[in-house]
Amino acid sequence: MQKSRITHYFFILILIGAVMLLVSACSNKQKSTSSNGKVSIVASTNVYADIAKNVAGKYGDVQAVIKNSATDPHDFEPTTADAKNLTKANIIVANGLGYDSWMNKLASSVNKKTVLVGEDLMHLKKGDNPHIWYNLNMPTKYVNYLVKRLSKLQPKHAVYFKANGQKYLAKIDQIRKLAKRGNKTDKPVFVSEPVFDYALEEAGYKVGDKDFEKAVQNGTDPSPKTINKMTKEIEDKKIAFFVNNTQASSSTVKTFVKLAKKNGVPVLSVRETIPNHTTYLDWMKENYQNLANISKK
């Protein structure tokens, strides 16, 4: 969600101090499993926790720090309880790319290393689009990492982890086929912000309002020239459809959505966080199905 990126440094310093006291009371030994014999995995959000549950299966104890879809990962403030969970974790996962930087800081405070999916697995760089869960290459990279890491921690269950990983990625391939049913036009797509850009790219669409989405991402006002140009192109139906993130809006975006509907331009509604009680696979399937459907309009 495109809110101001306020970093809670003072809060983090206080939390780190409390965590260090906690760590001093805990064992510093790195175990291959938690006390219940399972591999402990802690992820920043439900996206990465849900995927991990599918790979680790009955041999994993997986938790997400952020469990509610209404919570904005950008501004989340972890607690000492969150820190305590990290001290027990064998694998710690974060999105990276500045999206959930608090997770990396929290892990460092308890002398643990976080795997940053964006940087470490997808080899993206600071400034790249952080909404990588809409990039279908992400689950492929992440699942392969989990299979390898879990197999190292529990070699006797390596075949089980590999089978789970292959089964999961086969379902991702089915979603990828949905993406290929898209784009039957050369018209560009307008977006309210870059949250869905990876999916659009997967389906072969091009974003036509880069200046607008860049301004939104940077928390600045788009220029009047940009607004006027977009307004004219929507009225003239020069775009395929308009992508609207329903979790983050503004008066300008609302005006564009209203204008698009008035002029018969389809509007594709998306969201940034996974809905509660929904799996990542179901969420992506729904999004890519909606994308395939709107291309037929």
Label for each model-derived stretch:
Residues 2-15, 22-297:
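Extracytoplasmic metal-acquisition and chelation regions
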